[in-house]
Amino acid sequence: MKRFLLSFVLILCLVFGINNHAIAKDNIEAIETISQIGSLANSGNYMQALDKCNQALKKYPKEPDLYYWKASIQSSINQKHEALENFNKAIALDSKEATYYVVRGICKMDLNDYTGAEADFNKAIELNPNDATAFTMRGCAKLAQGNIDGANNDLTKANELVDVQEGIISK
């Protein structure tokens, strides 16, 4: 039964994009809460998701995924500076999660900090060299800074990665 439950939780994490932080803490309630927040946010119920996230952060203040979701929601409702603070908190708690750097970089681009965004995309690529989104966004940051050749190289690499990933999926 325990093995089945763990398998079910891992499937939920894959479906809802949850990292393994809450799993490492062996806390099913935290996983369920993060899943609910993600579902609310993904369906456009931002204020309800934000409220649930704030409540969860009182209970799980060291859970980086909660800061990630809070920041993502804040970014969606145009609270970019607040979002940046929460992306920073997520990264402070887990500096090995490439996704956090990508989304923080996107937030920095929204704030016209293209140099900072490029640095975040560099870190994401260092952590996950097959992240097509990181290459795409770094290309956009380079383009915004006038580095057309660098942007072209990154966008070409992103396309190659997408082609490889599509090939794997279609097999």
What kind of feature is each model-predicted range?
Residues K2-K171:
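Alpha-helical tetratricopeptide repeat
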